[in-house]
């Protein structure tokens, strides 16, 4: 099962990908998480990425594609993968096709999560993350048991720089300019499915998992 999840920042790609990863036993590959790990490690790449993410801009394709190819060649991707946040552009989509072709593989499905700008802003500005274990919360839909404290490890939750409203709106505009055309790209290849991500998350997971079971059966 080889799929990509498309949609604006805050459409719910990461949460859905994690649920599907557990359900189907394939890795959830998030370039965003990889970059944040690099930032935390303080590597040269991490410093570059930190400056880019803090400004709300996108990481250059050359860096992204290199990280992706290295990840896909790991053994746990043999049976499939779920991409969250990649590809973001037509150029990245073409690069992914070329990477998979070298590995004698191809995408099974591209799932587009539809969400309005105001929904995205509301979700992301309410999002909090544990700096220690990486668990993600939402103060509205998935709050921690104790205010601003991680349920799992007791750390104080933080808001990421790229979840502040000004940056969120900038990211949404960038999404419209660069990522939205991917919907047409994958639709033209007849592997696109669009779903409404503004509904109850459990219902969304149920519907998407049912769809994927048909694809891999």
Curated annotation (Swiss-Prot):
In terms of CDD domains, this protein maps to: ADK
Q: Indicate which residues the UniProt annotation says bind AMP.
A: 31, 36, 57-59, 85-88, 92, 160, 171
Which residues take part in binding ATP?
Answer: 10-15, 127, 136-137, 199
Enzyme class label: transferase
The Gene Ontology biological process annotation of the record reads: AMP salvage
User: Matching InterPro entries, A to Z?
Assistant: Adenyl_kin_sub, Adenylat/UMP-CMP_kin, Adenylat_kinase_CS, Adenylate_kinase_lid-dom, P-loop_NTPase
Against Gene3D superfamilies, the record matches this protein to: P-loop containing nucleotide triphosphate hydrolases
Alphabetically sorted, this entry's keywords are: ATP-binding, Cytoplasm, Kinase, Metal-binding, Nucleotide biosynthesis, Nucleotide-binding, Transferase, Zinc
Answer yes or no on keyword Phosphoprotein: no
> Which pathway is this protein engaged in?
Purine metabolism; AMP biosynthesis via salvage pathway; AMP from ADP: step 1/1
Question: According to its record, what are the GO cellular component terms?
Answer: cytoplasm
Q: Which chemical reaction does it catalyze?
A: AMP + ATP = 2 ADP
Q: Where is this region: LID?
A: 126-163
Protein origin, superkingdom:
Bacteria
MF term (GO), any: zinc ion binding
Entry EC number(s): 2.7.4.3
Enumerate the residues binding Zn(2+).
130, 133, 150, 153
Q: What does this protein do?
A: Catalyzes the reversible transfer of the terminal phosphate group between ATP and AMP. Plays an important role in cellular energy homeostasis and in adenine nucleotide metabolism.
Instruction: Tell me the subunit arrangement.
Output: Monomer.
This chain belongs to which protein, by name? Answer: Adenylate kinase
Q: Which organism is it from?
A: Pseudothermotoga lettingae (strain ATCC BAA-301 / DSM 14385 / NBRC 107922 / TMO)
Q: What is the lineage of its organism?
A: Bacteria, Thermotogati, Thermotogota, Thermotogae, Thermotogales
């Amino acid at each position: 099962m080889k799929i990509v999840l498309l949609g604006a920042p805050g459409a719910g790609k990461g949460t859905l990908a994690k649920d599907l990863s557990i359900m189907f036993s394939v890795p959830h590959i998030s370039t965003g998480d990889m970059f944040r790990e690099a930032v935390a490690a303080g590597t040269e790449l991490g410093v570059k990425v930190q400056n880019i993410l803090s400004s709300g801009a996108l990481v250059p394709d050359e860096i992204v594609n290199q990280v992706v190819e290295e990840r896909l060649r790991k053994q746990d991707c043999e049976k499939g993968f779920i991409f969250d946040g990649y590809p973001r552009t037509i150029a990245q989509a073409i690069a992914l096709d070329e990477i998979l072709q070298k590995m004698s593989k191809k995408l099974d499905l591209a799932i587009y999560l539809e969400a309005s700008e105001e929904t995205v802003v509301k979700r992301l500005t309410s999002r909090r993350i544990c700096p220690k274990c990486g668990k993600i919360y939402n103060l509205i839909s998935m709050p921690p048991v104790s205010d601003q404290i991680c349920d799992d490890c007791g750390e104080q939750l933080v808001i990421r720089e790229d979840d502040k409203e000004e940056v969120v709106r900038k990211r949404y505009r960038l999404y419209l300019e660069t990522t939205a055309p991917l919907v047409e790209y994958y639709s033209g290849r007849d592997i696109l499915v669009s779903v409404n991500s503004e509904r109850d998350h459990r219902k969304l997971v149920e519907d998407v998992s049912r769809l994927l079971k048909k694809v891999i059966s």
